[in-house]
């Protein structure tokens, strides 16, 4: 076999290696997920392990700091270099990467695991907002309509002098009590009339 063909096969094998190292774990909502580290490792050597959740933008955010043991993320000793996520939610779904660093610092190995959490209810706030969005828009529209109606009614009434502007000089206040001077109100007697 020629050297060029061997390099081609080697290149294909190297490009397929990350795809073969990726494993998928499916777990039901609120259950415990055990993610095994798929990096190839030598049982004769000791490694320091770190786990990270790969975000959609491609950057990694560390989910398991070495100092936090009370977190819902823990690395138990049941299975070497595995990550246990307790009480999984839909937010737990995603791609996780384990990195093994040889204690001598000579080799770094990594593997990828995809976690799928099924059976979780959708976000309550999001579905509630979607459910009542039309009613909220209608209520807001009615409030705006009634405020506009009140404002235009007051302006129209002022223009028609129903409610005169008393701050302007020369205008009288409406609804003042009207009294007539020196008119005595007493019993009224009607003259007698004859019927024919």
Curated annotation (Swiss-Prot):
Function per UniProt: Transmembrane glycoprotein predominantly found on the surface of many immune cells including dendritic cells or lymphocytes that plays various roles in immune response regulation. Plays an essential role in CD4(+) T-selection, differentiation and stability by regulating the activity of the major E3 ubiquitin ligase responsible for controlling MHC II trafficking MARCHF8. Also inhibits MARCHF1 association with MHC II and ubiquitination of MHCII. In addition, acts as an important modulator of protective responses against acute infections.
Tissue distribution of the protein: Abundantly expressed in spleen and brain, but is also detected in most tissues analyzed.
Entry-linked PROSITE patterns: IG_LIKE
Chain ranges of the Ig-like V-type domain: 22-110
Disruption phenotype: Lack of CD83 expression on dendritic cells enhances immune responses to acute infections and leads to a reduced expression of MHC-II and an exacerbated autoimmune neuroinflammation. In addition, CD83 deficiency does not result in excessive negative selection but affects the size of the CD4 single-positive compartment through a defect in positive selection.
InterPro entries associated with the record: Ig-like_dom, Ig-like_dom_sf, Ig-like_fold, Ig_sub, Ig_V-set
Topology, Cytoplasmic side: 155-196
GO biological process: CD4-positive, alpha-beta T cell differentiation; negative regulation of interleukin-4 production; positive regulation of CD4-positive, alpha-beta T cell differentiation; positive regulation of interleukin-10 production; positive regulation of interleukin-2 production
Subcellular location(s) of the protein: Membrane
Origin superkingdom: Eukaryota
Annotated protein name in UniProt: CD83 antigen
Entry-listed glycosylation sites: 70, 87, 108
Transmembrane segments: 134-154
Cellular component GO terms, alphabetical: external side of plasma membrane
UniProt keyword annotation of Zinc present: no
Residue intervals annotated with topology Extracellular: 22-133
Keyword annotations of the record: Disulfide bond, Glycoprotein, Immunoglobulin domain, Membrane, Signal, Transmembrane, Transmembrane helix
Cystine connections: 37-98
């Amino acid at each position: 076999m020629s050297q060029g063909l061997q390099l081609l096969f080697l290149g294909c094998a190297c490009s397929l290696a990350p795809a073969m190292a990726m494993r998928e774990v499916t777990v039901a909502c609120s259950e415990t997920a055990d993610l095994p580290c798929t990096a190839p490792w030598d049982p004769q050597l000791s490694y320091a392990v770190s786990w990270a959740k790969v975000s959609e933008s491609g950057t990694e955010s560390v989910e398991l700091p070495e100092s936090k043991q009370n977190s819902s993320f823990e690395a138990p000793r049941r299975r070497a270099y595995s990550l246990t996520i307790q009480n999984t939610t839909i937010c737990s779904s995603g791609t996780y990467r384990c990195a093994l660093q040889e204690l001598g610092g000579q080799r770094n190995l990594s593997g990828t695991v995809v976690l799928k959490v099924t059976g979780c209810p959708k976000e309550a706030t999001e579905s509630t907002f979607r459910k009542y969005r039309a009613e909220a828009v209608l209520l807001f529209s009615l409030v705006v309509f009634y405020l506009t109606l009140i404002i235009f009614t007051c302006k129209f009434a002022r223009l028609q002098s129903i409610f005169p502007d008393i701050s302007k000089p020369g205008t009288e206040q409406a609804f003042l009590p009207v009294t007539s001077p020196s008119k005595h109100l007493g019993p009224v007697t009607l003259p007698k009339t004859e019927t024919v």
